[in-house]
């Protein structure tokens, strides 16, 4: 069974936009980086698409996605959209020796983290979603989660009932 990103972690973002990747996520990143042999592991941060967060993929998972995009007919609207939002609006990231990254300016813009918030200190939420993880501005994540749950699942309902609808 493949390694998976699981859990939810709030991490401080310092004035230089550095943030520590949660240790369990670092293990998955390392396992998903074919070139990793100790030292600094790499992953891909995608800031494209109409959403309030960035998504992060292991190198292996991103290779799978790129193969699927390559399989689409050249020049089609679907392929162009995916190329732009998953490839062009993406960055290769490398963990530093302390397991941190510097959130890139485009990523900070996507999350809505302002320079003033960096100076005063802010938090990011890391949310594991199996084959990828999301990075959110912490207060945006909390608000979005509450709103989403109200729409998808009635209060008191068993969340596993959502799997029954798919036959899984």
From Swiss-Prot:
NCBIfam families registered for this protein in UniProt: PRK00326.2-2
Membership in a protein family: Belongs to the MraZ family.
Residues of the signal peptide: none
Keyword entries, A-Z: Cytoplasm, DNA-binding, Repeat, Transcription, Transcription regulation
The organism of origin for this protein: Cereibacter sphaeroides (strain ATCC 17025 / ATH 2.4.3)
UniProt record, GO biological process: negative regulation of DNA-templated transcription initiation
SpoVT-AbrB domain sequence ranges: 8-51, 90-140
Taxonomy, superkingdom: Bacteria
Protein name: Transcriptional regulator MraZ
Entry GO terms, CC: cytoplasm; nucleoid
A Pfam family annotated for this UniProt entry: MraZ
